[in-house]
Amino acid sequence: MDDSDDEYSRSHGETLTFVDPEDDGVSIGNTQDSQFAYEQFSVPTQSSQATDLLPGGTDGTTNDLPFHDVEDDESDSEKSLTEEQHEQKLPEHACRYCGISDPLCVAKCTVCRKWFCNSNDGTSGGHIVHHMVRSQHKEAYTHKDSPCGDTQLECYRCGSKNVFNLGFIPGKKDQVVVIICRTPCASIAFQNDDNWSPEDWKSVIAEKQLLSWIVNVPSEEQVARARKITATQAVRMEELWRDHPEATVDDLNKPGLDREPDHVQLRYVDAHHYSKVFRPLVAIEAEYDRRVKESASQAVGTVRWEQGLRQSVLAFFHLPQFADGVMKLAKGDELRLKHSQTVDGSEWTKIGSVFKIPDNHGDEVGIEIRGAVDKSVMESRIMFTVDVVWNATTFERQYKALAALLNDSKAISPYLYQKLLGHPAEEMMLKFDLPRRLSVAGLPELNSSQMQAVKQVLTRPLSLIQGPPGTGKTVVSATIVYHLVQKTEGNVLVCSPSNIAVDHLAEKIHKTGLKVVRLCARSREHSETTVPYLTLQHQLKVMGGAELQKLIQLKDEAGELEFKDDLRYMQLKRVKEHELLAAADVICCTCSSAADARLSKIRTRTVLIDESTQATEPEILVSIMRGVRQLVLVGDHCQLGPVVICKKAAIAGLSQSLFERLVLLGIRPFRLQVQYRMHPVLSEFPSNVFYDGSLQNGVTENDRHMTGVDWHWPKPNKPAFFWHCSGSEELSASGTSFLNRTEAANVEKLVSKLIKAGVQPHQIGVITSYEGQRSFIVNYMHTQGTLNSKLYENVEIASVDAFQGREKDYIIVTCVRSNDILGIGFLSDPRRLNVAITRAKYGLVLVGNAKVLARHDLWHELINHYKSKEMLYEGPINALKPLNLALPKATIRTKNNIAGNANRFGIKRMQYTFNEYKSNDPSQPRLPPTYSNSQNLLSMSKLAQTFNKNVPIPAHMMDPNVYAAARNQKDRRRGDQRRPPPQAEAAMDLSQGMMSQQSQQYPPQGASSQSQYLLDGASSLSGWSQSQTTTTTTRHHHHRQNRNSQQQMSQDMDDIQQKMDDLLFSQDC
């Protein structure tokens, strides 16, 4: 298990649990994990064959691999055994994966009573640990003949049996160790006994195996004689055991056991084909979500009761599984509270909506129960149990949207229908008289790239806007909506997959003076929101009329109405809701809520979807199956993508957003290019690596100098540094996440020092990719922090996902991963790194093990950047000293690629810019310029024209009869070695927008054709910008191979220069 063990809810920042992405098998899904190769991220695998299905699996393995028994060599006369005979011969305590039965090497899962060995052959950890992670069984029992004897592993103080939370410390007597849980017992012991320190505690699990003095690791000879099992098979066994506990490995080979769904495609024949692909994926995701939610039942003990508003009752309780990261909740989710301690033994049950989840202010979960609760229940000490109520509404709406696409010809315009399916459609422009002034009162003035995006979007039926961090995409979206309202009949619908993003955009649009209604799902009408004054519920109370207002007040006071009054209330409410929605200029809601029945009669022809790269295609479909004629998608495919919890669905392509697919089809996004968030020092690395050096700084160093704060950075005028620390990682109590106690202690030191320096706690954010680390830091600050625990409550400690789209003045990133062999998991995803290091305005601190992280090429580049800028340090916080570290050679390639300046660390690119063609060194990074004087439109236009020459060369300007050949990756060289620029692009079917590698063929030796150029191909989405047309794969090669082709192409460069100048001139006009 790796970081895919940690995933997070995009709406409220709570986490979703994922398991072991470094295993090769299909497991709980994580769409932003290192298991996805960079081709799947930047140009998904289907792009290599635009009309073919995606290849199955992530690692080339099949799902029906048979097991092979190893013959027993002890007796020459013994014949090989069949699988069935082998199973019959094995003793009860044999490993259920591989069959190893040495009592010294096995342990029993106390929950399911199955035995497993401590070998990691075929899996990323010991078989017993792998089983406990996958099944979420957390208790183990050693064999009577094992080193520890017949023993239940448990804490000697509290009796906790959670193996993932157990460790040991030296006993006060020689040759004795004490098994004790990490929290709370070890923490208490360290505080009360000076003879013990936190460094003395060691986990009983190291490198995902039980320590050998507890359960021996099988020898190489034992492993060689055992049944061979792959990670895929182990995962499938765990899934099979959920419904069939007595299943054996033979059952894996039964036909039809695990049919893989069809993969998404770049293009679809028709709506029937589209629906046939996506309906099974939605069904798989829905079933998996249901299973996960309904299996999350646990005892919560006693409940604390309070009287709420509107005659509701509030129930507060502790959820141990939430603290462990097993149960995932978001505000608005429904929980079922129940007990069986009634007089007649019947079950008492109530359903409530979650309004509070554990945070820095407290570790209780709070639910609001509508209606009365018997006093006898509230006053008795009853032991309650909690279940999660699964809500199928979201998936049902996706089914209906797919059906509408199939059956309703009026559900979407013919043009958008063709674009959705990937068919060629004649480009069209909408009739729209552009206003003389594009900037809107109440919003900041637009810069040049923002103006260009607004102009283009208003006149097109389909537009994509890419908004890198801090570039003001919310301002641009609000401006677009304002102008659309002035020219469009009916409402403009604004959607996002995230409630937080909807609230933020609704607030920004409201500042323009438009009438905005924030439509919430009925289950969330009483949930917290940052724009309560815009909600439909609030506007009903204010503008609903005297009779309706009276009934609303009566309902709030009494909790419910009499039958006659309730009918009248519902009638008046429906009429008034329709009036308010019909009269609104803009309706804001989530993508799912766009299918709310209250919108069924509202005419909407224009839809803008914010954060569209975080939504799956069926989610987007829900928003647009309303007869939509104009669609604007806003997002950034270089940041986090959709959350898909079922890995099988994610691998099949459900995790690819519509935004990404449209880019692959040749629709050019308009990229915003001026960032207003980060100090220029902080923006340099993400600009060069993730955005091809295109980000300009709209703020200066002086703008990002914090006054009134007594904080001194190790390197003056450089508000960032990497703090190297070598503490070891540990599995968290959930078994599906990680924590690093050394880094947590250093984070507390940094936070405390910032607060002492005058920084307000709410200005500080701590980012981690691991729920285990987040939970540990929160607890550590409250129990062992040097300042008053109240001061830490307003320090936000959250996941990367929770911080996307947001910012803080100071950001601390704790990397957590520190091991010798297991890799860095989540951290290998460049999109996560991009989000994490682009949240800070004034200062950024990275805390991690530089030696371990530098083995990965992208982190090697980041750490080398910090080292070159003299921002790499080690030592105590008050005595930091430069780290003189010889960085190890990066041995792990980036799998998820969004590299812009790709040649710097060997990542392919889809295209090169015209300036790179003209220059002789495309590998030279372009530093982000400072974008000054935003009020001078003439200088803005001139600068934009100059800067926009850094765009990919349109394919039609190149010779269409070009051959391309891939160069061996081993021939790549890092450093400052100069390479010739590419001289041509691969052949391409422009009418279809095909990016087929079939057109890239090796030319015959000695061919004299002028189109005989060897080019270096690539696949990255990050280089697409507002000046881009349909691009194809380009390839450049070694000097000696290219010398002749350079001479052949030189005569065409002047013509290309003139065509590019004409293109840029026409765009600027």
UniProtKB/Swiss-Prot annotation:
InterPro entries: DNA2/NAM7-like (IPR045055), DNA2/NAM7-like_C (IPR041679), DNA2/NAM7_AAA_11 (IPR041677), P-loop_NTPase (IPR027417), SF1_C_Upf1 (IPR047187), UPF1_1B_dom (IPR040812), UPF1_CH/ZBD (IPR018999). Its EC number is 3.6.4.12, 3.6.4.13. GO terms for molecular function: ATP binding; ATP hydrolysis activity; double-stranded DNA helicase activity; protein phosphatase 2A binding; RNA binding; RNA helicase activity; zinc ion binding. It is found in: Cytoplasm. Zn(2+) 3 binds at C155, C158, C181, C185. The keyword Nucleotide-binding applies. Gene3D superfamilies: 2.40.30.230, 6.10.140.1240, P-loop containing nucleotide triphosphate hydrolases. Phosphorylated probably by smg-1. Smg-3 and smg-4 are required for phosphorylation. Zn(2+) 2 binds at C109, C112, H131, H137. PANTHER family: DNA2/NAM7 HELICASE FAMILY, REGULATOR OF NONSENSE TRANSCRIPTS 1. GO terms for biological process: embryonic genitalia morphogenesis; nuclear-transcribed mRNA catabolic process; nuclear-transcribed mRNA catabolic process, nonsense-mediated decay; regulatory ncRNA-mediated post-transcriptional gene silencing; siRNA processing. Residues 155-185 are annotated as: C4. Keywords: ATP-binding, Cytoplasm, Helicase, Hydrolase, Metal-binding, Nucleotide-binding, Phosphoprotein, RNA-binding, Zinc, Zinc-finger. The keyword Zinc applies. It is an enzyme of class 3 (hydrolase). RNA-dependent helicase required for nonsense-mediated decay (NMD) of aberrant mRNAs containing premature stop codons and modulates the expression level of normal mRNAs. Is recruited to mRNAs upon translation termination and undergoes a cycle of phosphorylation and dephosphorylation; its phosphorylation appears to be a key step in NMD. The formation of an smg-2-3-4 surveillance complex is believed to activate NMD. Residues 51-65, 991-1013 have a biased composition (Low complexity). Residues 109-137 are annotated as: CC/SHH/C. Residues 1-86, 966-1069 are annotated as: Disordered. GO terms for cellular component: cytoplasm; nucleus. It comes from the Eukaryota. Residues 87-244 form the Upf1 CH-rich domain. It comes from Caenorhabditis elegans. Residues 28-50 have a biased composition (Polar residues). ATP binds at Q450, G467, P468, P469, G470, T471, G472, K473, T474, Q639, Y676, E807. Residues 95-127 are annotated as: C3H. This is Regulator of nonsense transcripts 1.
